[in-house]
Amino acid sequence: MTEEKKFSGSNRPARKQAVPERKELPASQRRHAAKLADGTTPAQGGSRPSRPARPNNNNQNRPNNGGQSQNRNNQNRSNTSTGGQNRSNNGGNRNNRPGSRVAPAEGRPMIREKKNWSTKPREGQVDYSAKPDNSLKQYVNENEKKRQASAAAKHPKKPAAATKPAVKKETSATKPATASTTTGAGKFGGALASGNNSARNNSRKRNTNGTGQQTPRRNDRPRGSKKSRRIAAKHQPSTPATVRKEQPLPAVLEYRVGMNVQDLSKLLHRDTAEIIKKLFLLGIVTNQNQSLDEDTIEILAADYGIEAQAKEEEDVADIDRFFDDENIDESKLVSRPPVVTIMGHVDHGKTTLLDYLRNSHVTEGEAGGITQHIGAYQTRINDKLITFLDTPGHAAFTEMRARGANVTDLTILVVAADDGVMPQTIEAINHAKAAGTPIIVAVNKIDKPGANPDDVMNQLMAYDLVPEEYGGDTIFVKISAKFGQNVDELLEMILLQAEVLELKANPNMPARGSVIEARLDKGRGPVSTVLVQQGTMHVGDPIVVGNTYGRVRTMTNERGVELSEALPATPIQITGLNGVPQAGDRFIVMADEKTARAAGEERAKRAQEAVRNSGSVVTLDTLFNTMAEKAMKTVPVIVKADVQGSVEALSGSLKKIEVDGVRVDIIHTAVGAINESDVTLAEASGAIIIGFNVRPTPLAKSQSDSEKVDIRFYNVIYNAIDDVEAAMKGQLEPVYEEKVIGKVEVKELFKFSKVGTIAGAMVEEGKITKDSKVRVIRDNVVVFDGEVGSLQRGKDAVNEVKMGFEFGFTVAKFNDVHAGDVVEAYVMEEVKPK
């Protein structure tokens, strides 16, 4: 039996010293050790007594030749040598660690021990193996008490959880040392070589991190790195995915011929991919946008086990059917603001009245002080909205006034007290009566000297407008729009009349209404002023307007404020159309953009066919045939303007002009700048281009100069009408035709102080005469058109120079002839009627 070590100050058994493996010394070290054993080393010099040799653990069970025959077995015992140093492995002596260089004692060589793995804990790690057996339990209990105290402080009402008594289990550290644990066995010997490895197991106890619960072992932890586990947890759904419930198939598939897979998927409540796959299995290859015929749709329905029934084809281009009163649900009608149209003669104060109502200044910005196109405005009076339509009073705007009367609920007839009833006043009365709208007469300018409102009332009685004070039913209000006199009374009458009419609309339906004005804006494209009559319009609605279509991109009111929706009786400006509609066209919001596109394209196609069939369209062939027939004298004119209302007004006025059988033929009208196509058409037909508030593009201007196309610009319609009428009167006079008689090229210039510059030239074609007119052309551009000043050959003045001769000449009132200029000589000959 080996000797057991006593416990020193603790219940922990002393750690056994690791005995290194025996190692054979080299020959030189063996000889040196033998000399040390004999005590005859040179270092001693015989003066110092020999020190006992240090025990060599490598030499197990071998006697020391130095005279000390102690038995050096492998038992682990503490060193009690002088100096009080604890040389056992339990101490902290650095030189006693395995693998360190041990300072040799006298009589022993320096030997590097074989490296042994240390079981000491790392820095900052708790070494539970150095504590008593119950230290771990005590440490855990202390942490449990701290946790309970912290929980009680946070939740005072909740009693702390009772601590379960720790069950004492016998571990390898508390077992008494046995022979197997005390004897040196194995490679390392001592406790490290024992089967239980109690010291090693105690040093590897898992940390509790202060929670009283041990961290899981490596085999118990989830596999994968922290990053991979975090990514997996992120993509793992927290809740199981819900399976979408498939809607049942319809009992009967009502289809239209030409529907595609995408349309059928909405009717069948199935995905397009499923339908395409089913058709492919049936031997039909298609995609979701390809139209299907009747047989294919019926085969698909039969495969699904349902019946198929073709619906009657609807005329998508017929949008007028939506404006029937039968399509309006009366149970959903609500009150709406009245739409009031202001009519009257020129300068009777219509715009001034509206300007006073909405506190703006439109009159100052209008050309000539006359309203050129319809303006739609909405104002609030006594917490009630009133929509006003301002129609110009000139006779040229008859059609615009008629459109205003068709969309209006009330008509305000403005008559000047100092001017009385005028032709346009009578025209306004007729339009209002034709539309069936009530008329309220506003006798304006009562503040002017010489105003006679009673005379105006008497004049209007001849047109069935009898005042209430005379026993009639027409409301008369005497006002002064300039100073606002009695304007409030006029507004009260408007609201009173609106209550009598019981104006209602359904805001919960697709919007529909009429176009008040349309124009082409350079930055925003087609801009249309529309009046919503039924429903509510939203931004993004697919819309059909006249013969065009689009999607509402923006909506703004009269002040330029963007709106998200527009209720009934609201005038707005919209953008997003593909073309410029006609003023007075109807619009309607469709279910989707595809339907709107189909309806707009079909309406445009039908409109072109109607014009072609009527024979009124003007092409190059029909134009030349008409001119050749000489049925009547015509003046071809092309009209371009900034807005559609001005185009129609100017065209209508020009068509009414007729002087002794000569009339104006409007061959083309459009909105926007004058372009190259207009110039080409004018050059081919010999037409005059009239631009109203527009200018030509640079290319069109260059083309018109080279092709001698006459372009006239106006900003007041009066001037355009007067000029055309004067030209038509000149047309009735004898007709002269230009005839080019010669062509001359300038070769050289001669300058004289008294005469000026004389051009030396040669006649290339024809001849030039003293009485002929000349046209100076430079780089295909006419720089001057005038008469011949002088004509000489040598020093003699001549009246004529023929082809092939050189001569000198001057141009009257023009002294800027250059070498290389081409001069055309022509005369004006009267054309005799046939």
Swiss-Prot record:
Residues 1-247 are annotated as: Disordered. Keywords: Cytoplasm, GTP-binding, Initiation factor, Nucleotide-binding, Protein biosynthesis. PROSITE patterns: G_TR_2 (PS51722). Residues 369-373 are annotated as: G2. GO terms for cellular component: cytosol. It is found in: Cytoplasm. Residues 335-504 form the tr-type G domain. Residues 480-482 are annotated as: G5. Residues 390-393 are annotated as: G3. CDD domains: IF2_eIF5B, IF2_mtIF2_II, mtIF2_IVc. Residues 45-101, 149-165, 173-201 have a biased composition (Low complexity). GTP binds at residues 344-351, 390-394, 444-447. PANTHER family: TR-TYPE G DOMAIN-CONTAINING PROTEIN, TRANSLATION INITIATION FACTOR IF-2-RELATED. One of the essential components for the initiation of protein synthesis. Protects formylmethionyl-tRNA from spontaneous hydrolysis and promotes its binding to the 30S ribosomal subunits. Also involved in the hydrolysis of GTP during the formation of the 70S ribosomal complex. HAMAP family: IF_2_B (MF_00100_B). This is Translation initiation factor IF-2. It comes from Leuconostoc mesenteroides subsp. mesenteroides (strain ATCC 8293 / DSM 20343 / BCRC 11652 / CCM 1803 / JCM 6124 / NCDO 523 / NBRC 100496 / NCIMB 8023 / NCTC 12954 / NRRL B-1118 / 37Y).
